[in-house]
From Swiss-Prot:
It comes from the Bacteria. It comes from Lactiplantibacillus pentosus. It catalyses: (S)-lactate + NAD(+) = pyruvate + NADH + H(+). The active site is at 179 (proton acceptor). Gene3D superfamilies: Lactate dehydrogenase/glycoside hydrolase, family 4, C-terminal (3.90.110.10), NAD(P)-binding Rossmann-like Domain (3.40.50.720). This is L-lactate dehydrogenase. NAD(+) binds at residues 18, 39, 44, 69, 83-84, 105, 122-124, 147.
Length: 320
């Protein structure tokens, strides 16, 4: 696709807490003229469509309805949130086998419908499931994007904003690597109002140990939320809306997403979180951050962790 049509259509596959939060965020922002909700639980998709329809007098007109995989045929964007949720005490990587099975039953009927748009994947473990979507679909890597570390980077910016009493939108900082336990804060490139975060921290008496604790807090925040209320969904729903907006409005926005590595950071044949330019044709360019030697090692170690789980998961799926 060279550009988006005037009438934009999005299909959401998976109407759980994340999916419905994403649908609500899209409705609030008035993004896309047609929004289809697909899930095996039809009563929920019908109910959500009716509920979201009621918001249109306050937002923007939109055709919202419960649909089928066949509705993907003329969609611009298919967003996959379907999958088993992460339970208390469970890592994202623990979900791999059951969610690979679920994903394999989704991608084929989407592609068989004649869909020729962009896949955006958010189901966990998202880096692995994004890779699997790319493999199962046969689509170009630029048209299969993961939510990656978009939510984690938002958490980092919020935490740094609190620490230094600035608007999180004025913080330019990224979490990179796996969306999960091996992720890391790329502090070497992080800035607040063009000034390096470490310089600002030093001036305010915030030590490297303090920054490391802040990073740990970001890494573990999902577990904190899951333990308190069972799941995370508002943050990731909003992150998905932001990525969708960049695609549908051809923004060429730099966002932290799950992108296919083809030599960047010394990595190949893996999807992993990195800043990238996102627009109407999908992922237009990876922004290869100038990481420190320590950060580059963390990136490569994170990729190695993902690749092992990915290979084991795909092998088990093939043996079934």
């Amino acid at each position: 696709m060279s550009s988006m049509p005037n009438h934009q259509k999005v299909v959401l596959v998976g109407d759980g807490a994340v999916g419905s939060s994403y649908a609500f965020a899209m409705a609030q922002q008035g993004i896309a003229e047609e929004f289809v909700i697909v899930d095996v639980v039809k009563d929920r998709t019908k109910g959500d469509a009716l509920d979201l329809e009621d918001a249109q007098a306050f937002t923007a007109p939109k055709k919202i309805y419960s649909g089928e995989y066949s509705d993907c045929k003329d969609a611009d964007l298919v967003v996959i949130t379907a999958g088993a949720p992460q339970k208390p005490g469970e890592s994202r990587l623990d979900l791999v086998n059951k969610n690979l099975n679920i994903l394999s039953s989704i991608v084929k009927p989407v592609v068989d419908s004649g869909f020729d748009g962009i896949f955006l994947v958010a189901a966990n473990p998202v880096d692995i499931l994004t890779y699997a979507t790319w493999k199962f679909s046969g689509f170009p890597k630029e048209r299969v994007i993961g939510s990656g570390t978009s939510l984690d980077s938002s958490r980092l910016r919020v935490a740094l904003g609190k620490q230094f009493n600035v608007d999180p939108r004025s913080v330019d900082a990224y979490i990179m690597g796996e969306h999960g336990d091996s992720e890391f804060a790329a502090y070497s490139t992080a800035t607040i109002g063009t000034r390096p975060v470490r310089d600002v921290a030093k001036e305010q008496g915030v030590s490297d140990d303090d920054l490391a604790k802040l990073e740990d807090g970001v890494r573990n925040k999902a577990y904190d939320i899951i333990n308190l209320k069972g799941a995370t969904f508002y943050g990731i729903g909003t992150a998905l809306m932001r990525i969708s907006k960049a695609i549908l409005r051809d923004e060429n926005a730099v966002l932290p997403v799950g992108a296919y590595m083809d030599g960047q950071y010394g990595l190949n044949d893996i999807y992993i979180g990195t800043p990238a330019i996102i627009g109407g044709t999908g992922l237009k360019q990876i922004i290869e951050s100038p990481l420190s030697a320590d950060e580059l090692k963390k990136m490569q170690d994170s990729a190695a962790t993902l690749k092992k789980v990915l290979n084991d998961g795909l092998a088990e799926l093939e043996n079934k």
